[in-house]
Amino acid sequence: MTVRPIRPSDYDAINALHRRVGWPERSLAGWRWLEANPARREVRAPPGWVSVDAEDRPAAVVCNFVQRFGHAGRPLHGATGFSIIVPPERKGASRGLIRAFLDQPDLFARYTLNANALSAPTYGLSGMKAWPPTTHALKLPWIVDPAACLRSRVWRALLSRIPAEAAHRVGERVMNARLDAEPALRLPPGVFPLTDLSDGSAYGAFWRRLSAEDRVLADRNPATLRWRLADPDQIRRPLLLAHARNGRIDGIALAIVAKANILDAPSLEIIDLTALEGAIARAVSSLGAV
């Protein structure tokens, strides 16, 4: 099975693979946003790989998201494998795709998130290990809309016996109407929405202090965060909050609305929650209370 890097001409076929499993498709603007990832360009990594058929058409795919990291002033790069789609008739193609992902040069880490029970053994066969060893399977959900969760389960049961692509034609069934409205946030003292991400902003000063500390950090400098928040395919604008003490930011939280497919209830996923040394307990407690 031939594996090669993704090309722009593959996007329609990759979206068709997403439809087959009931996953959201990317718009052309969304694919171009991924192409523009500055970290990916620095290490000249492809946006992913496809396993192709005899006519060189994508028949299976893994996408590649490169991020900058840093430790004590040393720049690092890591990559996340995502949207791994291997139809039943391409059984075995996952190994070549995962191997292409793992063989990328100039990276200190290669990983994937949210591996389900069906796909997890495939990663183990490729030499990947669950990490952290004791908490990798731990999730902490707060159910705030039980009715939406129940509707999601009912629709899954009703549509479980038909192909995901056919289920996709049923259309959206569990989107929460509240997502179309700007929420009135009740924020703890010291917590506020963060809107100024210019290089000379209070957030920029926070990032410079944070990146000087002796720990590995995902790069969230102002320019990177501006690019990250500009994803044209996001369901709604991410929630970015800061905690400040004595007029200086000492912690931030970033959360996004996630919805893996039309049958999933929307959820708010915390993807960043970090603070300066010495302010972790105070800032994380306040930000987490939101």
Features from the language model and the residues they span:
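A conserved beta-strand-loop-helix scaffold within acyl/acetyltransferase catalytic domains
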Residues: V3-I84, G190-A275
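Acyl-donor binding region in acyl/amide transferases
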Residues: G70-R153, A258-V290
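Acyltransferase donor/substrate-recognition loop-hinge adjacent to the catalytic core
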Residues: K129-V216
